[in-house]
Amino acid sequence: MSKYSKNEAQDWANINVTGQWSTLMTPFTPEDDIDENGIRSDVRRLIELGSQGAGCTWGMGEFWSLTTEERKQVYEIVSDESEGKLLTAAHVSHSSIKTVIDLATHAEDQKFDLLVLAAPYFVTKKENQVIE
């Protein structure tokens, strides 16, 4: 995993996370497989429109309905199609910390610019525990 300080990350975000961003939906084929061509088409369209970035497997991307392997497949497709032409963010939340680490590592390997991690959504903690 990348090593950087909180301040370095904030400085990078202040400079780079600007403009219009979009959340990619995860399209499926009639056979209920990930629609690779659909994802590629959506990414190309965002680039054509001048979007600054795209997030995948977020709420609109139905992260809760995808297997870990499907989420990784989406990361691979988005990374390949975006080719550095827009910033990419991967939602890596899961109820298992091992799966979070696996997804985060895979997204980093695919050269994603940002990771999005929501606070645990099953057994929740007090506000100060989440912030820590």
Describe these PLM feature segments.
Residues 2-132:
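Active-site beta->alpha loop and helix N-cap motifs at the rims of alpha/beta catalytic domains
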